[in-house]
Amino acid sequence: MLEEFKKFALRGNVVDLAVGVIIGAAFGAIVNSLVQDVIMPIIGAVTGGLDFSNYYIPLSSKVQDGMPYAEAKKVGAVIGYGQFLTLAVNFTIIAFVLFMVIRAMNVLKSREEAKPKPVAEVPADVKLLGEIRDLLAARRV
């Protein structure tokens, strides 16, 4: 059973999947930082210094106006649409980057497929048989 598990775990697809998940997690952290530390502050500056991460709709009377989102969540129920907006921007960026990567891979793949395949040289014995056939056909005419 241990040997069977070893074969399964070391198969190419499982290892490739593990590498993909690890790289994906690291890429997610980079995109998170890009959105939260670069894009959202720019959007906030353009819109007059708004911090979208603290935008919410209180659903409880215990939540007071002006409370930070994290504190408001502790006090009562809130709908954090600012946080949702930030995550939607994250998703859009990740989807766009993945689209560009897959598009680039498809272009490279189509270029590779478009290259003319090398024509295999006909073996000498087949070539000789073809010449004999042609000579015999010429005699009949």
UniProtKB/Swiss-Prot annotation:
Q: Per UniProt, what is the membrane topology?
A: Multi-pass membrane protein
- On whether NAD is a keyword of this UniProt record, the answer is no
The entry's keywords: Cell inner membrane, Cell membrane, Ion channel, Ion transport, Membrane, Transmembrane, Transmembrane helix, Transport
Query: From what superkingdom does this record's organism come?
Result: Bacteria
Q: Which InterPro entries does the annotation name?
A: Mechanosensitive_channel_CS, MS_channel, MSC/AndL, MscL_channel
Gene Ontology molecular function terms on file: mechanosensitive monoatomic ion channel activity
The subcellular localization recorded is: Cell inner membrane
- GO-annotated cellular components: plasma membrane
Family per similarity comment: Belongs to the MscL family.
User: How does the annotation summarize its subunit structure?
Assistant: Homopentamer.
The protein's name is Large-conductance mechanosensitive channel
Which gene is this protein's source? mscL
